[in-house]
Amino acid sequence: MRNSFDWGYELELSRTSGETKSVSNCKDLTKANLAGFTAAKAYEYGAFKAYLMQCQTWSEMAKLAASKRSFISKLKLDDNFPKFTPSALAFVISDESEEKVKTLPTWDEADHIQSTRVASEVRAEYFDATGGFQVITVVAKGDYNADGIEDIVIEKENSVLSGSYSSSHGYVLTRMSEQASFTVLAEW
């Protein structure tokens, strides 16, 4: 399994008690995180979070199987994608905005996407009305929940045009027809 593959380098971690440890694979990183460890150096915190995100994505991808039917074969990351995607993908930076987003049906309604820059068939940037932008990347396709229908695993990176805020999230999305809206099967 991918979680136990050695990265070829070590990430130094520590916890508030002063205890330190080095990890070099997803399995050890995940265990250390659950035990309260974080990046030993403040400037490596972003890398620590990115590694956790990537490890979880690999773990979720490992659950994919061959699908019998697909309603995402013609999926395009374009201006319409946010209109068919749940508000769970919205750019949320506070508990208050999270509560508001939950009441809205689509990502587009939550973030008011103003423009889209398509980088490739599997990657696009979405710019919202408040100076935020999200990069969506389709990383895998397959049957996630054993219903025979093809699902997609995506990664979402949130950033702001002026400032230093950033966050990363992963999702498994599905839909039951070519025109149907997507639903979230898993989120991390």
Role assignments for model-derived ranges:
Residues 147, 151:
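Acidic carboxylate motifs that coordinate Ca2+ or other divalent cations, activating on Asp/Glu
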